Amino acid sequence: MEIIIFDTQQQLDAYAAELIVNTVNKKPNAVLGLATGSTPIGIYDKMIELYNQKKVSFRSVTTYNLDEYVGLQPQNDQSYAYYMNKHLFSHVDIPEDQTHLPNGMADDIDAECIRYDTMLEAQPVDIQLLGLGHNGHIGFNEPDVNLSGGTHAVKLKDETREANARFFDSMQEVPTSAVTMGVGSILKADTIVLAVRGADKAEIVKEALTGPITTSVPASLLQTHARVIVLLDREAGRMLE
């Protein structure tokens, strides 16, 4: 595991974007695993900047997102499909049919999970971008006695819904469940990039990276992966220094 601490968020964003863009430039048909939330926005902005500077093309790339809320239409401005179009896809040359998210509106969610895993098996992820939840979740893999290996539906814990409530008009509007890639699916990526910022994440960063490997801190399972690059701003990394 490689851990890099940056003085500024801008430096972190630029470094993460370069990692992803370099992967694409070395392998134009790379498979990218993408994340949502507040942390990746600056990374996607930098990727768009590099695209506009003609330093990368995404036209042969395939993407798989970690998760999607159950019950939100893709056109809903709080869906992750909407987020990805707003923050990345609509600004670069990636064809729409090469971008994939779990379908949170599927009539049969179990069948949708199988479909998504089948696609991931056929197109293994070259580089997976992750954020980190306050309780150690990655994707929507919440702390639990048993963590599902593959894509699955999950009931969201209250603390996760509260953390995401800032994006909605009220707590009542925050979905109670989601479809997420499992930890097993995430760990199949060739390279994993974990990007974390903010003093409020410092404690869970230390626990996930240096504490025991346990399903009560899902991100701690990243310690078992051969190639994880952890990118932290100074505040998130303060308990490691």
List the model feature ranges, each with a label:
Residues 58-128:
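Ligand-binding beta-strand-loop-alpha-helix segment within the catalytic cores
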Residues 38-39, 69, 134-137, 199-200, ...:
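Short glycine-rich anion-binding loops that position phosphate/pyrophosphate groups of nucleotides
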Residues 33-37, 65, 102-103, 129-132, ...:
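Short beta-strand segments
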Residues 26-52:
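Glycine-rich N-terminal segment of FAD-binding domains in flavoprotein oxidoreductases
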Residues 30, 38-39, 43, 119-143:
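A glycine-rich beta-strand to alpha-helix segment
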Residues 1-32:
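N-terminal glycine-/serine-/threonine-rich phosphate-binding loop
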Residues 182-184, 188-241:
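ATP/nucleoside-binding phosphotransfer catalytic cores, i.e., glycine-rich phosphate-binding loops
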Residues 139-183:
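Class I SAM-dependent methyltransferase SAM-binding "motif I" and its flanking Rossmann-like core
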